[in-house]
A protein has these predicted regions:
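A conserved beta-strand-loop-helix scaffold within acyl/acetyltransferase catalytic domains
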Residues: 170-220
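Acyl-donor-binding surface of acyltransferase catalytic domains
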Residues: 64-154, 277-278
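Short amphipathic alpha-helix that is part of the acyltransferase structural core
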Residues: 1-18, 53, 111, 125-175
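A short, internal acetyl-CoA/4′-phosphopantetheine-binding micro-motif in the GNAT/acyltransferase core
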Residues: 53-61, 217-224, 253
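Conserved GNAT acetyl-CoA-binding A-motif
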Residues: 78-88, 240-251
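Conserved acetyl-CoA-binding loop-helix of GNAT-fold acetyltransferases
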Residues: 64-72, 216-221, 225-242, 261, ...
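Conserved active-site alpha-helix within GNAT-family acetyltransferase domains
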Residues: 91-107, 226, 230, 254-273, ...
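N-terminal charged segments
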Residues: 1-78, 91-93
Length: 281
């Protein structure tokens, strides 16, 4: 049975904007447009890094269309494809998604937003692991440009993520660069589990202001079913809470029902409906 869905529009907006803040890096900007937030990367045209988040526009047709034209023009001046990510609930206007689809946008993906509502399951997982006096599992935390082990750790983390998410091997170097970029940013850390020295599970934690966004949570396919994903997630949550985070959140792809159930089991709840990624065709 699915856990109750949270229906707080202010929380939904807070999470989407916080996610964008957690994805800032050197040169990447988050602009407050007054009626939405624009994430813009001058060096990378990938739509994921160039998107308008949580827009709030007039409901009347003419002002809505005028604002949409302005936003499309803004993306064009930045030499980017218009990419809009509405809220999972509380959109203004309420039929924002339908209007954008009618205006020529395509849904290229969708996910659900989840926020920690009960820390007890994660605390219990961590406590059970801490109670072990010996074992092959080791936990590493890489943050603030400081690695707890040798320089090869980033390669190991990228290899785990590439396997976990079936990423093209040619992109492994890009993954490694992204991993290193995370640890160079204040508040961003990579958590990794090793089993007898082999990297087996990874999670990324971005703690910004009073919240934490978790992402890139993955386990090597040949090591799944052993509780490693639960453990690395629980350790990331524990770190976030210890850092004083008032909220901890993550995103799950819409068609990944097992992942939703997995995170619900760790104390997370779904916020609103789906969050579509809309790209102008």
């Amino acid at each position: 049975m699915a856990a109750p869905t949270l229906t707080d529009p202010a929380l939904a907006r807070r999470l989407l904007v916080h996610e964008a803040r957690g994805q800032l890096s050197l040169g990447r900007e988050l602009r407050d447009l007054g009626d939405g937030w624009l994430l813009y990367d001058p060096a990378d045209s990938e739509p994921f890094w160039n998107r308008l988040v949580a827009p709030r526009w007039p409901a009347a047709p003419e002002p809505f269309d005028r604002r949409l034209d302005e936003v499309i023009t803004l993306f064009s001046t930045l030499d980017r494809v218009a990419h809009i990510r509405p809220l999972p609930l509380g959109n203004e206007p309420v039929n924002m998604v339908d209007r954008l689809l009618a205006a020529g946008f395509d849904r290229i993906g969708a996910d659900r937003r989840m926020v920690l509502v009960d820390p007890a399951p994660c605390r219990e997982v961590v406590a059970a692991w801490n109670a072990r006096t010996a074992g092959r599992l080791a936990f590493e935390r890489h943050q603030d440009g400081i690695a707890e082990v040798g320089p090869g750790w980033a390669t190991d983390a990228a290899t785990v993520l590439a396997a976990a998410f079936a990423v093209d091997p040619l992109r492994r170097v890009a993954l490694e660069t992204d991993v290193l970029a995370c640890t160079a940013r204040r508040g961003c850390s990579i958590l990794m589990l090793r089993d007898d020295g082999d990297a087996v599970a990874v999670a990324r934690r971005a703690t910004i202001s009073d919240g934490t966004y978790l992402s890139s949570i993955g386990t090597r396919p040949d090591r799944r079913g052993r509780g490693l994903g639960s453990l690395v997630t629980a350790l990331a949550v524990a770190d976030a809470l210890d850092a004083g985070s008032a909220f901890v959140h993550l995103a799950v792809e819409l068609d990944n029902e097992p992942a939703r159930l997995f995170y619900e089991g760790l104390g997370f709840g779904v916020v609103g409906g789906i969050v579509p990624d809309l790209l102008l065709r």
